[in-house]
């Protein structure tokens, strides 16, 4: 009998995830850069603020890592050497590693002073990530109001090639933008990624791939993941629900017709999506990004401890995703 992992190495994603008869040898495609850890499988993580309590919760819920957002404490310009040592001690004590950090900055800020400061700050984020043992830093692509897509592509490629990627090479890091559509993140769709990657061939630059943002734009996340499989360096695990009765009344430019959900409670076909990752040899972080109001509390998520309702969402997400991720299975 062919075992599951042997099958994943031999069978093409088109047979498993795309419903087609064609078989593709995964060895033909380049594997993306890894995130820390010797085991060659995706690491299930949560995206969260830093606190010892949150790392302890992640461990208790069966997660292997955390992806940490910058905040007033967790900041490369504020953390002392002693505080960094304490963070690393917490990582050792909990057994939950910091897989990556999130530095959502505007690398194309219109003001030259702000732009210079932002780029210097991002390099300090890279240095902090390296000290914490990370192999990836997530960010935005940036945005400049009034500039064309091609102009923004050219400027982003310049800062990547000339400033960021030499540092990444030195520190053994990958970087990439999350595909969240907003004013300071112009590169959020496949056509734009192709333009940027044509000018930035280094595979230390890739994507922090979030399929939920594609669903609400009616872009197929499975096909897109396969098309960019060798440039996916990190994953946000978040689902999207389309509320058809509302959409039928307000249209795509209206509000309230979609909402983010925890994995398994929206439209994404997670077995197919994760099959793409496994076929591609992805062994970075799959971080649950919890923006599901159904499994949360109105007052937000500011304290060192999560509310139990929010924890419940992460626990359910872990139970669901673990079905499809090899993880610590023997």
Per-segment meaning from a language model:
Residues 66, 101, 162-267, 271:
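Acidic/histidine-rich catalytic cores of soluble enzymes
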Residues 1-15:
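N-terminal secretory signal peptides and thylakoid transit peptides that target proteins
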Residues 58, 66, 91, 129, ...:
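Conserved, mostly hydrophobic/aromatic
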Residues 42-48, 66-68, 98-103, 137-139, ...:
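Hydrophobic faces of well-ordered beta-strands that scaffold small-molecule active sites
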Residues 69-88, 144-147:
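Glycine-rich, proline-tolerant flexible connector loops at the mouths of alpha/beta enzymes
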Residues 11-20, 32-36, 48, 52-59, ...:
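Active-site acidic/histidine proton-transfer and metal-coordination neighborhood
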Residues 304-329:
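C-terminal helical cap(s) of enzyme catalytic domains, especially alpha/beta-barrels
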Residues 49-51, 71, 103-106, 142-144, ...:
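Active-site beta-loop-alpha junctions enriched in small/polar residues
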């Amino acid at each position: 009998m062919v075992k599951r992992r042997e099958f994943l190495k031999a069978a093409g994603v088109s047979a498993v995830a795309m419903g087609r008869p064609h078989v593709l040898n995964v060895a033909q495609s380049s594997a993306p850069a890894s995130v820390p850890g010797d085991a060659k499988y995706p690491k299930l993580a949560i995206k969260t603020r830093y606190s010892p309590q949150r790392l302890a919760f992640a461990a208790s819920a069966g997660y292997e890592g955390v992806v940490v957002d910058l905040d007033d404490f967790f900041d490369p310009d504020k953390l002392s050497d002693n505080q960094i040592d304490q963070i690393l001690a917490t990582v050792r004590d909990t057994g939950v590693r910091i897989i990556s950090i999130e530095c959502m900055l505007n690398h194309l800020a219109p003001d030259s002073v702000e732009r210079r400061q932002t780029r210097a700050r991002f390099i300090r984020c890279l240095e902090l990530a390296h000290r914490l043992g990370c192999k990836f830093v997530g960010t935005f692509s940036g945005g400049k109001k009034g500039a064309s897509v091609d102009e923004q592509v050219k400027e982003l490629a310049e800062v990547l090639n000339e400033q960021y990627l030499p540092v990444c090479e030195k520190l053994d890091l990958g970087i990439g933008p999350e595909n969240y559509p907003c004013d300071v993140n112009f590169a959020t769709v496949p056509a734009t990624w192709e333009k940027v990657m044509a000018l930035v061939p280094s595979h230390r630059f890739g994507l922090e791939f979030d399929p939920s943002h594609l669903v609400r734009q009616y872009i197929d996340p499975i096909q897109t993941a396969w098309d960019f499989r060798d440039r996916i360096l990190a994953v946000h695990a978040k689902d999207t629900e389309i509320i058809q009765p509302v959409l039928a009344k307000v249209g795509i430019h209206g509000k309230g017709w979609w909402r983010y959900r925890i994995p398994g409670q929206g439209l994404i076909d997670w077995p197919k999506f994760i099959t793409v990752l496994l076929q591609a040899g992805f062994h970075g972080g799959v971080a649950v990004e919890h923006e599901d109001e159904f499994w949360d509390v109105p007052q937000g998520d500011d304290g060192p401890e999560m509310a139990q309702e929010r924890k419940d969402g992460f626990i359910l997400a872990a139970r669901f995703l673990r079905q499809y991720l090899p993880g610590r299975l023997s």
